[in-house]
């Protein structure tokens, strides 16, 4: 947010950054790493909401950042900072200020160990938008994801890379996610998913090995565990490939989280590839939702997905047959071969 404030102040917008956690010297240390700031970037280190309101009356900014809501208190409520009553009252007053003055207000909130916003759920209900800034501890990129948005889709994401001078936008997330992918390795499949209106190529990795336990292990990282078990059952019943005595581990490379059902086809073939120890061609990409009867269902945004795969240099794309007619009309795919499959048996035969 401090970096965002700097960028907006350079555009001539007056920004007020209110910190209840850090001193001016601490903020200065972070700011010097990011770069120089203009005179339109204003810092205020207070914990009292009345002080913020008084300052806004004197010099109205375009944007206010509250860091964080758990440290700001109002004299109208007699309770400790961060309590339910304080958070609700301070948020309500800030919301009223935003509506009356037209100021955009960003509120920083603490999160729990589970990754959700700490404090009362009414905090999420009162605001217009809830954004989570996610990232693995050892990963070099961060994902800005919306879970509530009154003014647009919640499926849009932004991908950023951490650098020495702060966060930088990743203009081509697909290239970042596939960087370092090994060639001719079993259990590795590339799928094209949609995050809002943005197609992103991700690598699904699977490892299937003989189990030494009576109850085989099933582990998934970045994917719904129940979804993986469901696809294993479909693979056994409709595809004739039995993995009942095997441990199965599935992972999304790069630490991403994937909820798109169009990745089903990729998960299935990553498992089959590892089970048979036969590599899927490195220039092949696929997507499609798998039904319980083994059918491959059509997905939305097929044209954007195929176009993204062609742009990244893939030569073969396996898609649901119901999407094939629209994709065949595309003229900008170069020499890419697009194959439509109606069910899991056809897909297995082609591979």
PLM region descriptions:
Residues 2-6, 12-13, 28-42, 48-63, ...:
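Peripheral, non-AAA+ core regions of ATP-driven protein-machinery
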